[in-house]
Amino acid sequence: MAVIKGITPEQIAQICVGQYAGVDEVGRGPLIGNVVTAAVILDPNNPIEGLNDSKKLSEKKRELLFEQIQQKALSVSVGSATPAEIDELNILHATMLAMQRAVAGLNIKPSSVLVDGNRTPDFGVESHAIIKGDGLIDAISAASIIAKVVRDREMDALALLYPEYGFEKHKGYPTKAHFEALAQHGVLPEHRKSFRPVREALA
């Protein structure tokens, strides 16, 4: 595994060869729900305009690109780790597990895997961790969009089950509204019990 910071266009050209997969995660910081990862192999002959780090795109734009990625990519796979797995393994190791699941779910074995961030798990093929890769490499951008839309939809579904928590707004992140809901309504089965605010709410 190589960690690449400040990647140059020349380096991008060197590593973006063959049927490589981009991988990213969403949901390391929230107090509830799965950490969600995605792996995407794009089709160089069927480009998608407007790919970028999902955090820099509007919800409407993410949803539009989500559909285009599903239609145009060679392969798309989502992998998750549950709150129970997060509590057992810790969030870092659970995220690595979710990434392995996403790559294993691809219907094409990638020639290499490019991950946003500063570390990768063992995928059984060459891998590179690329800092800020979600804004630099289209396949990672696509993975960030898929993971973000999938996780947001999971939070919207949770909001229908527990409307008093406001998950459709804060998506489970540690906001003032979420802390107030925890204090008033208590901890849900889907909360991550190893995260301090949840642990304190249980005390």
From Swiss-Prot:
It catalyses: Endonucleolytic cleavage to 5'-phosphomonoester. CDD domains: RNase_HII_bacteria_HII_like. GO terms for cellular component: cytoplasm; ribonuclease H2 complex. Its cofactor is Mn(2+); Mg(2+). PROSITE patterns: RNASE_H_2. Manganese or magnesium. Binds 1 divalent metal ion per monomer in the absence of substrate. May bind a second metal ion after substrate binding. Belongs to the RNase HII family. Endonuclease that specifically degrades the RNA of RNA-DNA hybrids. This is Ribonuclease HII. The gene is rnhB.
